[in-house]
Amino acid sequence: LVFKITRVVKEYKGLKPGSGLGFSVILKECLRKTIGHGKVPEILGTEISILYYGLFAWKRPKQSGENVFTAYKKSGYGSIVGGLAFLSLSEVLAFHVLFMQISIVAAWIIFVLNLYGIIFILADFNASRREPTYIKDEKLYINAGIRWKAVVPVKDIKSIELSNESLRGKKILRAMTILSGPNLVIELEKTHRADGPYGIRKNFDKVLLNPDEPRRFRQLIIDTF
């Protein structure tokens, strides 16, 4: 086990410098190289990423540049998440005291599950901050918090339109921040695949996004065609 952990750390240090990739992407790649492909590295990578982003990744992100697009500043996402986390924690503590009078085991199970939910929301927010969507080498790197990640060649984009319409369908990737609606709709020439938590995969041919600068984002995509 110690040998495996040492190999993961070594692989991580080897991939991280100048890669431009986020923590969760590099971590899962290191786990796949060390443990092998399958559910185990996907589950481990997701759980470690949730704990890292939910509890430790609070330093202000340094990402900047004309090809990098955040999706949390203008929507008030941080304030919403902070308020939601505070209210949820207050409710969790209140329910914990109540259930302790009924069943200690049930009280602790409910407490842990609810606390995990709060950590997940915080992790998704921090992942949105530290792993923004960006364009590089004529490819669109879509990062939706801790939930979805996908890479789409710009040449495969059929259209990109300003829209706040929340479309429905099986092949629609909702790459917005939690609690936010879209302001951009991207239609693709063909189906692509997104990677989600715990090894979940999703095929999509439309993407809903909510970058802080939708018009600049759209224009940069058009200029890259």
Regions found by a protein language model. Give the residues of each.
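Single-pass alpha-helical transmembrane signal-anchor segments
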Residues: F95, I109-F125
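Conserved beta-hairpin
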Residues: I118-E161
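Non-transmembrane, membrane-adjacent beta-strand/coil modules in membrane-associated proteins
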Residues: A144-K206
